[in-house]
Swiss-Prot record:
The keyword DNA-binding does not apply. One of its GO terms (molecular function) is 5'-flap endonuclease activity. It comes from Yarrowia lipolytica (strain CLIB 122 / E 150). It is found in: Nucleus, Nucleolus; Nucleus, Nucleoplasm; Mitochondrion. GO terms for biological process: base-excision repair; DNA replication, removal of RNA primer; double-strand break repair via nonhomologous end joining; gene conversion at mating-type locus; maintenance of DNA trinucleotide repeats. This is Flap endonuclease 1.
Length: 389
């Protein structure tokens, strides 16, 4: 879910930190991708014309594999070197959010049964059609990625020669730390809390389908801190105040109020102190609000040491891909072999240095110094050499 209202707040207060881009602009870049988030997207979005998930002749869901195979090929075709990072065990602090998601899923399942009955009882017409569309919409709310689908995705990526990392906890935190350590250029996730973990660059919409025509959003963390005039620690406090997956926020505090409070007080401790000194005010701090525990988790997440992550891109196992995708999962052999050929082609291509690696922006001080030197010499006659006798 990420941080409530953060993207809109950044667009308003530090627009220089965000820019829209095309996938081709990241050629030559290594990117750590939140695999768990991507799989969830694929299971929801990769569907048949009637809205049902893709399945093989045995009735096994293949939406996750179809999405993973073709979206990864698209990135590789554009010169991107992806690293997929998978979730480990969720942190204890996230249990409340997971319970809420389970409750919403159960409510959606009940609604689906009601709507299906409505479709069965109704006559052909606009109302029945709308009810069927509602069934599809609510079914998407019940989607979850199973452990088996996770394992199949890992197997597919390994056969494709794409490196994977299994995080001990949150995938987006591991992605952020790989980027922070310089192992990759950016972290790619839809979760804005990736920024809290310190990723220098966050890419959103990277794994969306080309048909959506959704530009990739590139978010620069240093420019966020500069635009908001905050430290990393203060930014984390702001995000906790906005609301995240690990704790509820203070009721009545929206994005603008959260920013105002942080500007005025500078930390959550001082904000809590301010609110508690004004018991007659509108704002009330939740009982046993675990903001300090959440802050500690965001500042020091449970991740693998980046130096221990062995990230290597290998040749695809063509026959292994055919066995798995064609014989086991019912994919088209021609398409799978064509995809493997695309992977092999990119493995053989020698990486080209990016132009932005050749040029360095000169600091303003240099320009100022030159101007000052020009003023000193202005009006002076050039020195002349004496003629040799």
């Amino acid at each position: 879910m990420g941080i409530k209202g953060l993207n809109k707040l950044l667009m308003e207060h530090c627009p220089a930190a965000l820019r829209s881009s095309e996938i081709k602009n990241f050629g030559g870049r290594k990117v750590a991708i939140d695999a768990s988030m991507s799989l969830y997207q694929f299971v929801i979005a990769v569907r048949q014309a009637d809205g049902q998930q893709l399945t093989n002749e045995n009735g096994e869901t293949t939406s996750h594999l179809m999405g993973m195979f073709y979206r990864t090929l698209r990135m590789v075709d554009n010169g991107i070197k992806p690293v997929y990072v998978f979730d480990g065990k969720p942190p204890v602090l996230k249990s409340g959010e997971l319970a809420k998601r389970k409750e919403r899923r159960e409510e959606a399942l009940k609604k689906i049964e009601e709507l299906k009955q409505q479709v069965e009882d109704g006559e052909e017409g606009e109302e029945t059609k709308e009810a069927q569309e509602d069934v599809t919409r609510f079914e998407k709310r019940t989607v979850r990625v199973t452990p088996e689908q996770n394992d199949e995705a890992k197997k597919l990526l390994t056969l494709m020669g794409i490196p994977i990392v299994e995080a001990p906890c949150e995938a987006e935190a591991q992605c952020a730390k790989l980027a922070e350590a310089g192992k990759v250029y950016a972290a790619a996730s839809e979760d804005m809390d990736t920024l809290c973990f310190g990723s220098p660059v966050l890419l959103r919409h990277l794994t969306f389908s080309e048909a959506k025509k959704m530009p990739i959003s590139e978010i620069n963390f240093a420019k966020i801190l500069e635009g908001l005039e905050m430290t990393h620690a203060q930014f984390i406090d702001l995000c906790i105040l906005l609301g995240c997956d690990y704790a509820d926020t203070i009721r009545g505090v929206g994005p603008q109020t959260a920013l105002k409070l942080m500007k005025e007080h500078g930390s959550l401790e001082k904000i809590v102190e301010h609110i508690e000194k004004n018991p007659s005010g509108k704002l009330k701090v939740p009982e046993n609000w675990p903001y300090q525990e959440v802050r500690a988790l965001l500042q020091a997440p449970d991740v693998l040491d980046s130096s221990s992550c062995d990230i290597k891109w290998n040749n695809p196992d063509v026959e292994g891909l055919v066995d798995f995708l064609v014989r086991d999962k019912g994919f088209s052999e021609d398409r799978v072999r064509a995809g493997a050929a695309r992977l092999m082609k990119q493995v053989k291509v020698k990486p080209q240095a990016r132009l932005d690696g050749f040029f360095k922006v000169m600091p303003k001080e240099g320009g100022e110094k030159r101007k000052a030197d020009d003023k000193k010499t202005k009006g002076k006659k050039p020195a002349t050499k004496k003629a040799k006798k």
